[in-house]
Amino acid sequence: SRGLGDVYKRQVLKLGSVHQCNCCLGGKTLHPLVSVIDLSKADLSSHTDFKFGFYTILLGECKCEACRYGHQYYDFSDGTLICLTPGESISMKDSNNTRPSKGWILAFHPDLICGTALGANIRDYTFFSYRPEEALHISLREKQVILELLDKINQELQRCIDCYSQKIISKYIELLLDYCERFYERQFITRNEANKQIIGRFNRLLDHHFHTIQSQSADLPTIEDCAGSLHLSPAYFNDLLEYETGKSFKEYLQFKRFETAKDWLINTDKPLNQIAQELGFRNAQYFSRLFKKMTGCPPNDFRMPN
């Protein structure tokens, strides 16, 4: 589920189709697979918790701090954007019953993008797997870009459906998602100092794992384990890591294993078998082969000059 607080403590309204979403939130069904809904006209008095059976992009313009889903003092405050995959739930209010005063929803069914470039690449937009508290907080200029694209989609919906409708609308949605990707990268920039602190905590987690006795018999930490310890979604954590270090979680974990191995080779007398075991390699031979590939020399040669 997605949302502030426990959404399952309240009744969740399941909306399986775009038409149901329109009926509930006051939109008009101009196309069975896609809709742009003005939340300022929606009646949220009876339901604020929803489970959508389609892709949903929520642009909230609530000025209340509690409604901004993870907003930090270094973030912009002109809008909050959340992206949901089919089957996810979200609460449009917090524990203080604060609702967005206005905003927009772009709802589109997977069938709309089936067979299109967007359909083939939709998984590349990893922010669909972020938590609401990892929402995108946009500037006035960025919000204007999003609103202009929503207006373009709405204009296309006003036309009669023809053989070009799906293609054109899908391209507008793809462009909107590309802008979201750009704006998220900008948000990583504005959160640079906070992100460095997260990387520092991650490094300490790995150091603790590799330097405890338990690690000798334990599996390597997973991205789910580490992201959970840092109170982040795996998708957001991996994207943050790639932005800050240029490495994915898997690549960074491998990097840390070899950095730790170098440290142990120089500063301890641990045998290769023990180093390989404690760092999660299947055996000393496999570790030695990978170490040589990574550093250009075998572990014993790396250790000898020191």
Task: Enumerate the predicted regions with their spans.
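Short, small-residue-biased leader/transition segments that mark boundaries at the very start
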Residues: 1-8
